[in-house]
């Protein structure tokens, strides 16, 4: 089970293991439900981490310290 201390890659690997187990279909129904629930939790946590990383990367800081957010629909042009 992943903990909050696990990094993105560790959680992604755990999610991939869960998906593989469920795809194989050799998991009893009760265990499959538990694994599915854990997979959903991990997926949501990974989504939050990706969103936070995206927001961090989307900020540009000019040489004078002024921050500009990138338009997510047009990553090449900062918003004014």
From Swiss-Prot:
Its main location: cytoplasm. One of its GO terms (molecular function) is exodeoxyribonuclease VII activity. Its EC number is 3.1.11.6. Residues 60-80 are annotated as: Disordered. GO terms for cellular component: cytosol; exodeoxyribonuclease VII complex. Pfam families: Exonuc_VII_S (PF02609). Keywords: Cytoplasm, Exonuclease, Hydrolase, Nuclease. Residues 71-80 have a biased composition (Polar residues). One of its GO terms (biological process) is DNA catabolic process. Belongs to the XseB family. Bidirectionally degrades single-stranded DNA into large acid-insoluble oligonucleotides, which are then degraded further into small acid-soluble oligonucleotides. This is Exodeoxyribonuclease 7 small subunit. It comes from Lactobacillus acidophilus (strain ATCC 700396 / NCK56 / N2 / NCFM). The lineage of its organism: Bacteria, Bacillati, Bacillota, Bacilli, Lactobacillales.
